[in-house]
Every structure is written in structure tokens, then in C-alpha cells.
A protein has these predicted regions:
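Conserved phosphate/ATP/ADP-binding segment of small-molecule kinases
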Residues: 137-141, 148-219, 227
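Conserved N-terminal subdomain of the carbohydrate kinase-like
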Residues: 11-23, 40-120, 134-139, 289-310
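Extreme N-terminal starter segment of soluble prokaryotic enzymes
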Residues: 1-4
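Short beta->alpha connector loops
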Residues: 49-51, 123-128, 147-151
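Short catalytic helix/loop segments, enriched in acidic residues and glycine
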Residues: 19-34
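Short beta-strand scaffold segments in enzyme catalytic cores
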Residues: 34, 80-83, 208-212
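Conserved post-catalytic alpha-helical subdomain immediately downstream of the catalytic base
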Residues: 43, 224-294, 298-299, 304
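A short acidic, amphipathic alpha-helical/loop segment
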Residues: 56, 128-135, 156-160
Length: 310
């Protein structure tokens, strides 16, 4: 089955500790679509401007991404300018220019959502997320992401979007902004679940990800890397990978979520090893599976408890 990825393709300028990336293809949906397409046929809904390289859309199509839902504007593309701290832990957004995204129309996307088992609606204005959520087929498994800006400026709309979503992805700092209080983790997760999603995926950066909700708790550490050069898009790649894995398996249960989280974590590790989208452009599924097997072999399992007799 297919997955649906929406809505931002962009041109990025990113300052990193060891280099500066200028006018590179970016945007949350680029990372998410590349990740999703490793596991399932992927449909992309977005808009690009007159400066977006047509050859990149051709590349996405060759990777199994249906780009017919990508709209075109005569304005420049969505433009993100950012600078990372020396340790890559923090990023400062210097400029966000909507440009072509001001012309983005949601209703025309409806015909491209048919047959999509899952959908990842990446970080964007919650009012737009709501429109996309409402046009998706009712049985579609929906995943949304957000950021602290919308939690401050568009909280009522964001809460409505979270209530409609099956999976809500959020980082620790964002979660505290959302609930407007610093709480112990169990209380924080309880407050997030009251917003209505079936599952909360708690993004812990270099410490991995955790799942909470109606399917129980799952904790997946990060894959141990020798180096990371660019964290841009890692969370978007995670969301895209989860959508792709769920569509491939055609199931939404604890076991399929465990597979999706492990493979999503591995996809994120490939993402941060390259600049911009390089890591995702070059990786192939057998490499992902091999790294996942190595990763799982490093983790303790229930069998290890058999060594201790009660």
C-alpha cells in the first residue's frame, strides 16, 4: 500500500560547524518522501517555486515517489535559513520565507490520497494540517509533527489537529511548551495523550525515540554513530520512514510500530551522516536492513532473562 507525504519542499541555506550549505534542496517533505519511498510507493503533495530544480522532482520519481501532487508557482520556493550550534544540538532559524507556499492549495490533493494507508503531515501551520487531515480517507493512519512556534501562536488549531491524528511526534522541549508546564515524564505523557492521539512518539535526539499510548511503551535508542555532520531533516525522515513501514506492512499495531520505530531510527542515522539530503539519496533498503540487524544485535532481549532463575 501507499503512503502520502505532505506538504513542504524547500530551498535551504544551512550554516554548520564545518561548512555552509547554500541553495540546497530541503524541506520536511523531501526528507520524508525519500525515507518513505524506501519501504512503500509514496505520493507527494506539495508546491515548488520557479527556482526548484526540476531534475530533483525527476529524481524523486525514479525513487518511487509520485510527484503529480506537486503544484508549481511562479514565485521562489519556500526558503529556510538556519544556523546550527558547534555541537549540533541547537539550531536557530534565521529566516523562514513562505514564497511559493503562499499559493499552496489543499483541495486538489484529495484525488492523490486514494489508496494511501498512511500519511505523514510534517511541521507546518496547524490550520493547513487540519485541512489535509480532513481530506484524507477516514481509514488512513495519520502522523503529524509540529514545532514550538505553532504551540505558541496557533495552539487551538494545533490541538484540533492532534486530536484528529493517530500519531503525534514531539520533542521534549516542544512537549513542555505545548502543555505549558515542566512536568515529570509520566505526567507529561499523560497530558499529551489527553490531547487525543492514539500514540505519542517522543523524540529524544541523540538518545533515541520512545512510543507511548494505547499500544503500550516502546523505547528505541539511537544507532551509535562515529560522526554526524547535519541533523537537518532527521525528524522528518523518521516520520516518513514510519509512514512507509506501516504502509508496507498494512498494519497499525504494537508489532508494526516496533518495526517502524527501529527502521525509522536507522533511517535518521543515515540522514545525519550526510549533508542535507545526501544520506537519504544514497542509501538503499538492504543497507538499512543490515544496519538494523546490527543495531538489534546490540540490544538486550527477553531471552537474556532466562539466565536468571527465580
Amino acid at each position: 500500500m501507499k503512503s502520502f507525504i505532505c506538504p513542504t519542499l524547500a530551498i535551504d541555506d544551512i550554516t554548520l560547524p564545518d561548512t555552509v550549505l547554500t541553495k540546497v534542496v530541503g524541506g520536511s517533505s523531501t526528507y520524508a518522501a525519500l525515507a518513505s519511498s524506501l519501504f512503500a510507493p509514496t505520493v507527494l503533495g506539495s508546491i515548488v517555486g520557479n527556482d526548484f530544480p526540476e531534475k530533483y522532482l525527476t529524481f524523486l520519481a525514479k525513487r518511487g515517489v509520485d510527484t503529480r501532487g506537486v503544484q508549481h508557482s511562479k514565485k521562489p520556493s519556500f526558503h529556510w535559513v538556519a544556523k546550527y550550534s558547534d555541537d549540533l544540538h541547537d539550531v536557530k532559524t534565521i529566516k523562514n520565507e513562505l514564497n511559493a507556499f503562499e499559493d499552496f492549495r489543499v483541495p486538489p490533493l484529495k484525488k492523490y490520497t486514494k489508496g494511501c494507508y498512511s500519511a505523514f503531515i510534517s511541521n507546518i501551520d496547524p490550520d493547513i494540517q487540519l485541512k489535509i487531515l480532513k481530506l484524507l480517507p477516514k481509514k488512513t493512519i495519520t502522523i503529524i509533527d509540529s514545532m514550538d512556534l505553532w504551540m505558541i501562536e496557533k495552539l487551538p488549531a494545533l490541538k484540533k489537529a492532534i486530536k484528529l491524528a493517530d500519531i503525534f511526534m514531539v520533542s521534549e522541549p516542544e512537549a513542555e511548551v505545548l502543555v505549558q508546564e515542566k512536568l515529570p515524564l509520566p505526567s507529561l505523557i499523560e497530558r499529551l495523550m489527553l490531547l487525543g492521539p492514539k500514540v505519542v512518539i517522543y523524540k529524544r535526539g541523540e538518545h533515541g525515540i520512545a512510543m507511548y499510548g494505547k499500544m503500550g511503551t516502546l523505547i528505541v535508542p539511537s544507532y551509535p554513530l562515529t560522526f554526524a555532520v547535519d541533523p537537518s531533516g532527521a525528524g522528518d525522515a523518521l516520520g516518513g520512514a514510519i509512514a512507509g513501514v506501516l504502509s508496507r506492512l498494512g498494519r497499525f499495531d504494537r508489532q508494526s510500530m516496533a518495526s517502524a520505530m527501529v527502521l525509522g531510527s536507522i533511517i535518521a542515522s543515515f540522514t545525519v551522516e550526510g549533508y542535507g539530503t545526501e544520506g537519504l539519496e544514497q542509501v538503499i533498503l538492504p543497507e538499512v536492513i543490515n544496519r538494523a540487524k546490527v543495531f538489534l544485535s546490540q540490544l538486550p532481549c527477553e531471552d537474556h532473562l532466562n539466565l536468571i532463575k527465580p
